């Protein structure tokens, strides 16, 4: 038995497999940060904090003593509860392949948005300084005309190179910005293809962010520490529903402030 208590749930192995598959597929669809940051772990549920390598001076216990305390980043535990219909679960054992796992997919989307939001936008309550908050590069708005996005991205790439940040580089676009780029043409040529010609990395759909980010993927600049990776646990059940949850523990460290350029959403005209 572990802290997920899955063996107590009235769910067959076949149904568990379907639920897990749908959840994993949804997470893969919505998670963007894990494609561009360094992933450390999963190190297990017992991991409570990671060291930053820094020290802070504290009051000494006596004369002639210098006291310092090591700085750590405590991991954040995120949990998203959801309920599944027991009839749908039991139908799987009878051969059904069309059970409705939408609540599980909704939970996966919610927790994926939360993780990406913490990494890119920050999560002060969890002690996480996001990339937008921590970048030392100027933050400028995206152009109001999507046809000018390539110029804005090219300028951001130039900013990174000028501060000594090597590539490869990737671009993450929020849902609205990505849709605008995918649909736009400049004199008949797709704007998305124009972006792909100037960016040596990926152009990534990142629906949890606002605006865009241009950053290096050379490694060593952004650390995502995972304790317990996304896991489904059991809470309780009734005659009609099974109450589950999707959970993870993590923290994020921005190691190089100049390694990213953040672009805010376009200013309405």
Region locations from a protein language model:
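Extended, solvent-exposed, turn-rich assembly/linker loops in the middle of proteins
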Residues: 132-194
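N-terminal "assembly arms/tails" that initiate or stabilize quaternary assembly
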Residues: 1-68, 227-228, 233-243
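Short, catalytically relevant binding-site loops at active-site mouths
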Residues: 125-128, 176-180, 210-211
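Sequence/fold signature of self-assembling virion shell proteins
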Residues: 40, 184-269
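Long, hydrophobic/aromatic-enriched structural stretches that serve as scaffold segments
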Residues: 53-98
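A generic local secondary-structure boundary/capping motif
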Residues: 71-73, 158-161, 233-234
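Alpha-helical scaffold segments that mediate packing/assembly in large oligomeric complexes
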Residues: 90-155
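Long, hydrophobic, amphipathic alpha-helical segments used as structural scaffolds
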Residues: 34, 38, 115-122, 161-164, ...
């Amino acid at each position: 038995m572990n802290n997920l208590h899955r063996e107590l749930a009235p769910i067959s192995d076949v149904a568990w497999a379907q639920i897990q598959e749908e959840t994993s597929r949804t997470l893969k669809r919505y998670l963007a940060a894990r494609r561009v940051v360094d992933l450390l772990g999963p190190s297990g549920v017992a991991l409570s904090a990671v060291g930053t390598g820094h020290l802070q001076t504290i009051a000494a216990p006596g004369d002639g003593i210098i006291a310092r305390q090591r700085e750590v980043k405590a991991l954040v535990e995120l949990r998203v509860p959801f309920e599944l219909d027991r009839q749908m679960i039991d139908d799987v054992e009878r051969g059904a392949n069309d059970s409705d796992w939408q609540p599980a997919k909704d939970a996966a989307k919610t927790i994926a948005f939360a993780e990406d939001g913490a990494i890119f936008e920050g999560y002060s309550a969890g002690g996480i300084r996001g990339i937008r908050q921590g970048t030392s590069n100027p933050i400028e708005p995206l152009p109001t005309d999507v046809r000018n996005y390539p110029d804005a991205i090219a300028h951001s790439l130039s900013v990174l190179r000028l501060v000594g940040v090597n590539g490869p580089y990737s671009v993450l676009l929020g849902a609205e910005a990505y849709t605008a780029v995918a649909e736009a043409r400049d004199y008949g040529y797709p704007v998305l293809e124009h972006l792909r010609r100037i960016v040596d990395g990926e152009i990534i759909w990142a629906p949890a962010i606002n605006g865009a980010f241009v950053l290096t993927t050379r490694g060593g600049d952004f650390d995502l520490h995972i304790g317990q990776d996304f896991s489904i646990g059991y809470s309780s059940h009734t005659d009609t529903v099974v109450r589950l949850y999707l959970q993870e523990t993590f923290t994020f460290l921005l190691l190089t402030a100049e390694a990213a350029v953040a672009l805010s959403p376009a200013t309405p005209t």
